[in-house]
Amino acid sequence: MNPSSKKSILTDKRRFSLEQLRGKISPDSFHCQIEEYNEYLFNEALKSQNDQMAFTWLLCERSSGAIAAYMSLIADAIKLTATEKELHNLSYTFKTVPAMKIAKLAVSASFQEKYRGLGTLMVEMATEIAVACNEQYFACRFITVDADIEHNESVINFYLKNGFVPNEEIKNKRRKTISMRRDILFKAKL
C-alpha cells in the first residue's frame, strides 16, 4: 500500500481503546514483523504481568476487538551525565533519575498496512500513563526505551521523531539496542 494512502490514526484515536492484558493471547490474534515480539506477547507477557515484572497494554480496535499494537511497561531509573542533567535542569545529587521504560512495543503488520501513527499513538499513551503516575502515585521524569536496532535499524528515527534522545551515559555500550529517553515534564509543558 502506498504510504500516502494510509489513514493517519492520530486524527481519530477514538477508533481504538487501550486495555491491560487480562489473559493469554492466541497466536492467530496478532502478528508483527519481528517474531521475538510475537513470541513475547503469546508466551511471556501474561507471566511477566502476573510476576509484577511488566504490565502489557493492548491497543484494540473498538469495532472488531482486534489487537492493533501492544506495549509492555516497566519501572526504570537512568544515569545522566552532568551535561544531560544540565540540559534537563536537574541539580539533584541522586545517582539515578526515575523513569518508566517501554520494554516492548510492536504494531500488528495488518494494521501497519492500513494506518500511519500507531507506534506514535502508543508512545503518547505511555506518556499519558507516566504523567498519571506523576500526578497520583510516584515520580517518573522520563520515558526510556532500548531502541531495538538489531531487528530494525530505522527504529532510532521513529524514536527521535517522538521526542527521544540517546542516553550518553549508556552510549556505545550495547550493540543490539540504543538506550534513549524522553523528558515527560518537558513534553507536558508544550
Q: Predicted segment positions?
A:
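Non-catalytic substrate-recognition and accessory regions of acyl/acetyltransferase enzymes
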Residues: 1-114, 120-190
